[in-house]
């Protein structure tokens, strides 16, 4: 009975969520698009001509937002061919419905075949921005969840170290709680500028937060 009440309460909140309504109206696949939008508007992350990689992209709302931003850049420069001024590569273990002008690679980005496909799209270019809305399945056991969250962030940090240009940026989802300070410290070891971000679109009750790192300390 308690579980049913919880589900009904969640459904009521979801249906009445202004960001859910806005996402439906504006064609985004998830309300998460507005988290990236708010951070981007604050930090000017996405700019015309960039190479952007979206880790854990499904269902695709972050890639949709990035695509729309780069399409605006295309409109300002009618000389360019193609639909956007830049390149977006989305990766996920799960399948994802196609998004115009977005290269989708399904698989584990640590595996050689996926990395080979990625390098084929990059054509030797370094990445300007890595974005990650990845989150593990949480168990409710604090110590286990902290380890899973840290592992996800470690994967994004390693990917960024291997592919970002020196002045590039990494934005990842994280959660406040056990292990959070260790993740921030890892960002500080890797980036010159590190800042937490809690967009308004992130639900108040959620411990979800985002960490932004800019300018690699030890670029490869």
From Swiss-Prot:
Class in the EC hierarchy, top level: transferase
List of residues binding S-adenosyl-L-methionine: 60, 62, 92, 108, 133
Pfam entry (one): FtsJ
Reaction it catalyzes: uridine(2552) in 23S rRNA + S-adenosyl-L-methionine = 2'-O-methyluridine(2552) in 23S rRNA + S-adenosyl-L-homocysteine + H(+)
Alphabetical list of InterPro entries matching this protein: RNA_methyltr_RlmE, RNA_MeTrfase_FtsJ_dom, rRNA-MeTfrase_E, SAM-dependent_MTases_sf
Record localization: Cytoplasm
Keyword rRNA processing: yes
Keyword annotations: Cytoplasm, Methyltransferase, rRNA processing, S-adenosyl-L-methionine, Transferase
Active-site residues (renumbered): 173
Family: Belongs to the class I-like SAM-binding methyltransferase superfamily. RNA methyltransferase RlmE family.
Protein name per Swiss-Prot or TrEMBL: Ribosomal RNA large subunit methyltransferase E
């Amino acid at each position: 009975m308690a579980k049913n009440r919880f589900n009904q309460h969640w459904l009521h909140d979801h249906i009445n969520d202004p960001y859910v309504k806005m996402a439906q109206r504006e064609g985004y696949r998830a309300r998460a698009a507005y988290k990236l939008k708010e951070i981007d508007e604050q930090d000017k992350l996405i700019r015309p001509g960039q190479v952007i990689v979206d880790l854990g992209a499904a269902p695709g709302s972050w890639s949709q937002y990035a695509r729309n931003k780069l399409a605006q850049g295309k409109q300002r420069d009618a000389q360019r061919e193609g639909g956007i001024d830049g390149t977006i590569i989305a990766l996920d273990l799960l399948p994802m419905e196609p998004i115009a002008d977005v290269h989708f690679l399904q698989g584990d980005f640590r595996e050689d075949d996926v990395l080979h496909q990625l390098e084929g799209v990059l054509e030797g270019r370094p990445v300007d921005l890595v974005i990650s809305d990845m989150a593990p399945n949480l168990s409710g056991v604090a110590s286990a969840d902290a380890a899973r969250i840290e592992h996800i962030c470690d994967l994004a940090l390693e990917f960024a170290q291997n592919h970002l240009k020196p002045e590039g940026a990494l934005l990842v989802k994280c959660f406040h709680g056990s292990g959070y300070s260790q993740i921030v410290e890892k960002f500080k070891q890797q980036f010159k500028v590190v800042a937490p971000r809690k967009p308004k679109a992130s639900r108040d009750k959620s411990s979800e937060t985002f960490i932004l790192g800019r300018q690699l300390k030890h670029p490869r």
